[in-house]
Amino acid sequence: MPSLTTMLGLVSHAAAVERNWLQHYLGGKPREEINGNARGDAPSWDVGTGQTIDGVIAEFDSACAVSRQIAAGFTLDQAVPHDELGQVSLRWVYMHMIREHARHVGHADMLREQIDGTTGD
């Protein structure tokens, strides 16, 4: 079955989601000014042929480092506007990111089982 859901695609998507929630929403940076995909949509899963494992992991690490810098300037209950949700606080964003990453760790677990039969016993 053709799919963009790959181990590396999951990491690439996670980086885009970090950028979207922390840099765009909390940091207030326009998406077009963010270095890398900041939408979390289908293109965020697509790892181009020129990208390497180390490069995609470095992108995720970089996005997380910027996220930590931005979050350091907020209290947990400090809220910012969101175009669909009204207001979101840092606490809400953290909880959303935990859910988002947990869901995709589950996807990675299923992919791993398909690759080599390893299960998370």
PLM region descriptions:
Residues M1-P43, H82-D121:
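Short, contiguous alpha-helical
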Residues A42-P81, R91-M97:
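Acidic/histidine-rich alpha-helical segments that form the ligand environment
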